[in-house]
Amino acid sequence: MKKFTCVQDIGDLKSALAESFEIKKDRFKYVELGRNKTLLMIFFNSSLRTRLSTQKAALNLGMNVIVLDINQGAWKLETERGVIMDGDKPEHLLEAIPVMGCYCDIIGVRSFARFENREYDYNEVIINQFIQHSGRPVFSMEAATRHPLQSFADLITIEEYKKTARPKVVMTWAPHPRPLPQAVPNSFAEWMNATDYEFVITHPEGYELDPKFVGNARVEYDQMKAFEGADFIYAKNWAAYTGDNYGQILSTDRNWTVGDRQMAVTNNAYFMHCLPVRRNMIVTDDVIESPQSIVIPEAANREISATVVLKRLLENLP
């Protein structure tokens, strides 16, 4: 594996899952693999789980780790070509990236959608510049359109908790006071569509995702109908994708908050969320604190997904 930005990069899912469960039994089995190798983690945006889990994964593999917060202590970076740099950004990403590549063996990048221009976001300009110019293997720690480390961990979690070979998995939109990127729902849909699960997406009209991520999923605008018989409920907010509404909040309808009313029609479903979660906006206290909430094991599996990804990138270093 030379990069990791989407489900296709991981290859065969059964093999990746088997490797995940192997590593979960012995997290330090490959501690010699990363000896004298350095991971550079670059954050354009805030992080808790991604930062901690990826750093822990690198340590599991014996790597050195450098963490760079672009907006705290580093030069402000210009990202557009052709710009006259007479403002407050003294360095261009096109010089910074190859310099960063000089100091490490693998690069992880976290850069959210800006919601200024959909084409810019969906062309993944930032992470693709790292792939093109760093001279190093690059993996996504969440980009504008996908969050594959999260989705891989979600898949591991579902495989651990499922009670039937083909569970019904429902991803539901839920309200939030701020417009959030589509990266997590896009990525979750992409990974679920790579399985044989029954996969349903439910949201209010106007919140349709990019069709290339929706794929063969059934889209249901009636949340209660979508929840019927579900084995897993994956809640997430996202801003509008379509047309002139890109990046906007179209609804804050609290009827979409996941609570006991919705969970009652499921097949005693497990509740999942990538975290951080806005309680009593996305989900009620009762649901997230219930025995069916698996958000903490889900978050713990971020270490496992990151370890598998880093291991595979290390194995393909020259």
Curated annotation (Swiss-Prot):
GO biological process, any: arginine biosynthetic process via ornithine
Pathway membership, UniProt: Amino-acid biosynthesis; L-arginine biosynthesis
Effect of gene knockout: Disruption of this gene results in mutants that require exogenous arginine for growth.
Residue positions binding carbamoyl phosphate: S47, L48, R49, T50, W75, R110, H147, P148, L149, Q150, C274, L275, R302
InterPro entries the record matches: ArgF'-like (IPR043696), Asp/Orn_carbamoyltranf_P-bd (IPR006132), Asp/Orn_carbamoylTrfase (IPR006130), Asp/Orn_carbamoylTrfase_sf (IPR036901), Asp_carbamoyltransf_Asp/Orn-bd (IPR006131)
Coiled-coil blocks: none
EC class name: transferase
Primary role: Catalyzes the transfer of the carbamoyl group from carbamoyl phosphate to the delta-amino group of N(2)-succinyl-L-ornithine to produce N(2)-succinyl-L-citrulline. Is essential for arginine biosynthesis. Has no activity with either L-ornithine or L-aspartate as substrate. Also has no detectable AOTCase activity, being unable to convert N(2)-acetyl-L-ornithine to N(2)-acetyl-L-citrulline.
Positions contributing to N(2)-succinyl-L-ornithine binding: E142, H176, K236, R278
EC number: 2.1.3.11
Chemical reaction(s) catalysed: N(2)-succinyl-L-ornithine + carbamoyl phosphate = N(2)-succinyl-L-citrulline + phosphate + H(+)
Family: Belongs to the aspartate/ornithine carbamoyltransferase superfamily. SOTCase family.
Gene source species: Bacteroides fragilis (strain 638R)
Quaternary structure and interacting proteins, as annotated: Homotrimer.
Molecular-function annotations in GO: amino acid binding; ornithine carbamoyltransferase activity
Effect recorded for P90E: Generates an enzyme capable of carbamoylation of N-acetyl-L-ornithine at a rate 7-times greater than N-succinyl-L-ornithine, thus practically converting it from a N-succinylornithine transcarbamylase (SOTCase) to a N-acetylornithine transcarbamylase (AOTCase)
Keyword presence, Nucleus: no
Keywords: Amino-acid biosynthesis, Arginine biosynthesis, Transferase
Name assigned to this protein: N-succinylornithine carbamoyltransferase
Annotated site (Key residue in conferring substrate specificity for N-succinyl-L-ornithine versus N-acetyl-L-ornithine): P90
